[in-house]
């Protein structure tokens, strides 16, 4: 009986060691894609809800996912701050009437929606050298 218990204990220990030293069942976290590079000068054509179109300019500085820079529109100018997450961008103007731009980056072009005080419109932008 004692011999049986010893064999059983050794077998259990052996199985535990084999399973414990095998490949980990925990999955590795997915590799994060780096954010798109949006640093530079952009010209924005904003289509407001009333059907008007205005041209705006933004110069973006990028540090990883963080964005800062300068915004110039037809009636106001000021700083910007925002983020970029892979192909998605969000930035806000630091102006009297704060504008929030959200969009998708596609190389040297971006497009999306913007808003101010509950009113929303669409925008398209392209990299430039103004």
Across the structure, where does each feature detected by a protein language model lie?
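Bacterial N-terminal signal peptides
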Residues: 12-20
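Central antiparallel beta-sheet cores of small beta-barrel/beta-sandwich binding domains
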Residues: 27-130
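Sec/Tat signal peptide C-region and signal peptidase I cleavage site
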Residues: 22-26
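Bacterial N-terminal signal peptides that target proteins for export
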Residues: 1-11
């Amino acid at each position: 009986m004692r011999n049986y218990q010893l064999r059983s204990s050794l077998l259990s220990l052996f199985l535990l060691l084999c399973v414990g030293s095998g490949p980990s069942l925990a999955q590795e976290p997915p590799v994060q894609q780096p954010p798109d590079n949006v640093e530079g000068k952009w010209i924005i054509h904003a289509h407001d809800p009333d059907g008007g179109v205005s041209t705006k300019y933004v110069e973006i500085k990028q540090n990883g996912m963080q964005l800062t820079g300068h915004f110039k529109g037809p009636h106001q100018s000021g700083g910007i701050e925002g983020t970029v997450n892979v192909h998605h961008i969000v930035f806000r103007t630091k102006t009297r009437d704060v504008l929030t731009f959200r969009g998708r980056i596609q190389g040297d072009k971006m497009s999306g929606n913007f808003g101010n005080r509950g009113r929303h419109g669409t925008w398209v932008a392209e990299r430039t050298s103004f």
